[in-house]
Amino acid sequence: MDNRPIGFLDSGVGGLTVVRELKRQLPYESIVYIGDSARAPYGPRPAGQIREYTWQLVKFLLTKDVKMIVIACNTATAVVWEEIKESLDIPVLGVVLPGSSAAIKSSRSGQIGVIGTPMTISSNIYEQKIKRLAPQMNVLSLSCPRFAPIVESNEINSSVAKKIVYESMAPLVDRVDTLVLGCTHYPLLRPIIQNVMGLSVKLIDSGAETVRDVSVLLNYFEINRSREVKDKTEEYYTTASVLGFKEIAEQWLGEEVTVQHVDLDKELEND
């Protein structure tokens, strides 16, 4: 038993899609979440900057005495997950491998689509993981740089969002039977994406798939929390507007949440 919280980090609100799944599958676990919305999206940024920012988020979570870290951001996973995993003595999960495995299991035609940020797509990380596990699969990757900003600005139900998704997804329509949502922001656009791609296309939420691996590792390392839900804690931090984050978080999680603003430079300087 280990009653310490699980730490989640993301470039903004996207990682809440992973938290929602964790709360569904493992409702007794405590959570600390940090979203770097002030510097979102990470996707267009250079790798060195993404690495620096992600390490700041990791260091912040370590000050909260977390027992495990979930990098709930595909871009950060692509750039720095391996390095962080090797550097820490607690389990560190990324979201790419679970999403890749689920896509392989889902696809019948062998035609898999992947959408993500420019950095995730240019890194080729999904294609590499999928091909390593199943060389016969054909992977079609598409960068969708306008999706994460729509989510961060809470415009997911707008006509603009529908137009952008329709225009962006056109190259993949009728070409794949499985589509990996290779950014944790994208499940918030899931209804629109599904409508554009058609009901026959299976959408893979890489973040939700990751929670299954969280459960496996909790058991393996015997660091599950005692199943007393009443004593669990949830802390949510953002580097940007508390109100903006809170609005999206409450819509997505379906409950009231308390959000705190954090200045990472000051927080880590004082640590």
From Swiss-Prot:
One of its GO terms (biological process) is cell wall organization. Its EC number is 5.1.1.3. Substrate binds at residues 10-11, 42-43, 74-75, 184-185. The gene is murI. Belongs to the aspartate/glutamate racemases family. InterPro entries: Asp/Glu/hydantoin_racemase, Asp/Glu_race, Asp/Glu_racemase_AS_1, Asp/Glu_racemase_AS_2, Glu_race. This is Glutamate racemase. It comes from the Bacteria. GO terms for molecular function: glutamate racemase activity. Provides the (R)-glutamate required for cell wall biosynthesis. The active site is at residues 73, 183. Coiled coil: none annotated. Pfam families: Asp_Glu_race (PF01177). Pathway: Cell wall biogenesis; peptidoglycan biosynthesis. It catalyses: L-glutamate = D-glutamate. Signal peptide: none annotated. Keywords: Cell shape, Cell wall biogenesis/degradation, Isomerase, Peptidoglycan synthesis. It comes from Streptococcus thermophilus (strain ATCC BAA-250 / LMG 18311). The keyword Isomerase applies.
